[in-house]
């Protein structure tokens, strides 16, 4: 077995020979990371990415300066989808080691699930993986129901059925109930709704190759809220929470939905389809209707929903939308506590009316006259939240996945957002 490369931390600057701004240096004992107090976690993560790039696949985090957050920052940068890596962790107290172990188990699950090829991860497989993860941490405190295929149509889940019917792999709705009280009549504190498009070709509004090649990751919202619930449970979540995952492929076939089709939802809303590549909101609508029916204090939906959010924020921040200023502030406070990047974008009442249709109440996409695509998408979703002005958060997951490596991340999924949502649930 290869001897581990020892990684230590220092608050002293590197020797001048390494350069004025050197963040790490190498000596006979191993590698030293030089912290400057400005962005130590970011520095550690970027250094870990460089260490991996050197081909070093076995490391030992050594010394007393490591804590759970610093270990986690290292792992976020060190982990990559190809190859194997081994880390010998430092001695941590029991609470910190448990926190680190839970992050490794759950957030790595999120990253690995998002990175999985669409051939291996269809709608049914995604739903079952979510059940397995939650059951592993919740035991008998969880029950669930899986509805698929024509049963969705028969039960009125017309958005999910319409989008998913073009694939040989049936669309699936997972409804999972985490109820630690044991009381079947206990109120539901929160509902989490996730977009689980396991591959998005764009449908008849087909994507170009450059925009389709990462669309195995279009189920990132579903993976994120699943991970968030699991992580909140490990942190002692003692309130009832329901999870709704809307899982489907968006493909082209003789049975696929078409431009001009009209979908009638269970809440009476009629939606004209004018872009089959704006399918995420169509499946989320069904989940939000179910979530609203639970009368929870809090509804959070998460989706890799729009390119507009990425245009605004890149892949560095998740976009947050809400009519509830106090709730948005709470989530941003949770994000700050967990050192995860969220940024609030505008959502106003007028965005709800910027989806006009000549044949239905709503269009599933905005026109050139209304170019605020991320905000109008959130406005669309609000039509399916019963009390949309209070207790509802929409997360457009622009920081879920990276097509190419950068200085702090490998290519692929990041797992960002899991800890923030879990923090909010357990606050």
From Swiss-Prot:
One of its GO terms (molecular function) is manganese ion binding. One of its GO terms (cellular component) is cytoplasm. Belongs to the peptidase M17 family. Probably plays an important role in intracellular peptide degradation. This is Peptidase B. Homohexamer. The lineage of its organism: Bacteria, Pseudomonadati, Pseudomonadota, Gammaproteobacteria, Enterobacterales. Gene3D superfamilies: Zn peptidases (3.40.630.10). Keywords: Aminopeptidase, Cytoplasm, Hydrolase, Manganese, Metal-binding, Protease. The active site is at 207, 281.
């Amino acid at each position: 077995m290869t001897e581990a490369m020892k990684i230590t931390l220092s608050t002293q600057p590197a020797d001048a020979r390494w350069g004025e701004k050197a963040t790490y240096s190498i000596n006979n004992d191993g590698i030293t990371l030089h912290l400057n107090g400005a962005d130590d976690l970011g520095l550690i993560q970027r250094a870990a990415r460089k260490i991996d790039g050197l081909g070093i696949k076995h490391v030992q985090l050594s010394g007393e300066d490591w804590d759970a957050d610093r270990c986690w920052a290292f792992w976020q940068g060190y982990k990559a989808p190809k190859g194997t890596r081994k880390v010998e962790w430092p001695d941590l107290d029991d609470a910190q080691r448990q926190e680190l172990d839970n992050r490794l188990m759950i957030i790595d699950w999120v990253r690995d699930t998002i990175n999985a090829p669409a051939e291996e991860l269809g709608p049914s497989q995604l739903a079952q993986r979510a059940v397995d993860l939650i059951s592993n941490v919740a035991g008998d405190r969880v029950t669930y129901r899986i509805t698929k295929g024509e049963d969705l149509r028969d039960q009125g889940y017309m958005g999910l059925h319409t989008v998913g019917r073009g694939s040989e792999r049936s669309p699936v709705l997972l409804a999972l109930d985490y109820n630690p009280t044991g009381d079947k009549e206990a109120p539901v504190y929160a509902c989490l709704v996730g977009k689980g498009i396991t591959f998005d070709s764009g449908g008849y509004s087909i994507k170009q190759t450059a925009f389709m090649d990462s669309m195995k990751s279009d189920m990132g919202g579903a993976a994120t809220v699943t991970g968030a619930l699991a992580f909140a449970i490990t942190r002692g979540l003692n309130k009832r929470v329901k999870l709704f995952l809307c899982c489907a492929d968006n493909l082209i076939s003789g049975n696929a939905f078409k431009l001009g089709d009209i979908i009638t939802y269970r809440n009476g809303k009629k939606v004209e389809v004018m872009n089959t590549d704006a399918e995420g909101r169509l499946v989320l609508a069904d989940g939000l209707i179910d979530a609203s029916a639970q009368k929870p204090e809090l509804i959070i939906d998460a989706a890799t929903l729009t390119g507009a959010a990425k245009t605004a924020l890149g892949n560095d921040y998740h976009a947050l939308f809400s009519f509830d200023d106090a709730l948005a502030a709470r989530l941003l406070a949770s994000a700050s506590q967990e050192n995860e990047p969220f940024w609030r974008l505008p959502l106003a009442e007028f965005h709800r009316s910027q989806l006009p249709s000549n044949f239905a109440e709503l269009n599933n996409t905005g026109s050139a006259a209304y170019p605020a695509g991320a905000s109008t998408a959130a406005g669309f979703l609000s039509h399916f939240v019963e009390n949309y002005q209070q207790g509802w958060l929409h997360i457009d997951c622009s920081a879920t996945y990276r097509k190419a490596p950068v200085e702090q991340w490998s290519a692929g999924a990041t797992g960002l957002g899991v800890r923030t949502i879990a923090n909010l649930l357990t606050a």
